[in-house]
Amino acid sequence: MHETRDGVVKHVGQVEGVEVPSGTATVRQVLIGPEDEAHNFFLRRFTMGEGGSMPLHTNRVEHEQYVLSGAARVRIGDRVHEVRAGNALFIPAGVPHSYEVIEPPFDFLCIVPAQPDAVALVELADPERS
């Protein structure tokens, strides 16, 4: 990593990946975060392998995402989108969203505000129980 008074430069290979607890075959790297003294935004990279998924959930903060490789079905609210390398996504705060890999590795950058976040899993109503 190369640090200067004016910023931080690092290679993705220098950043430890951490399994996403609620995900399947999903790793998150915080490329730019609080330890880098970023005050407005954090930059994260997610890599999802074969069979990778993240369940329907909400976040307290919005997400801006850019797909680097692979393809996935991404649910945002009530709509399902098939996204692939080159697609950009905006997920507003509080909107339920999920991911299901269809072409691994599904690799994307995710920018979030430098604010406290909370993740909440969303359960869908079971029509059999209604």
Region annotations inferred by a language model:
Residues 45, 90, 104-120:
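A short hydrophobic beta-strand segment most commonly corresponding to one strand
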Residues 46, 71, 79-81:
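Well-ordered beta-strand scaffold positions
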Residues 61-63, 67-72:
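Glycine- and acidic-residue-biased ligand/ion/polar-headgroup-sensing regions
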Residues 55-56, 74-75, 91, 97-103:
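Short beta-strand His + acidic residue motifs that chelate non-heme Fe in jelly-roll/DSBH
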Residues 78-93:
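Short acidic-glycine-tyrosine-enriched beta hairpin
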Residues 52, 60, 79, 95-96, ...:
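A generic "binding-loop/recognition-motif" signal
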Residues 29, 44-59, 93:
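Conserved short histidine dyad/triad with adjacent acidic residue
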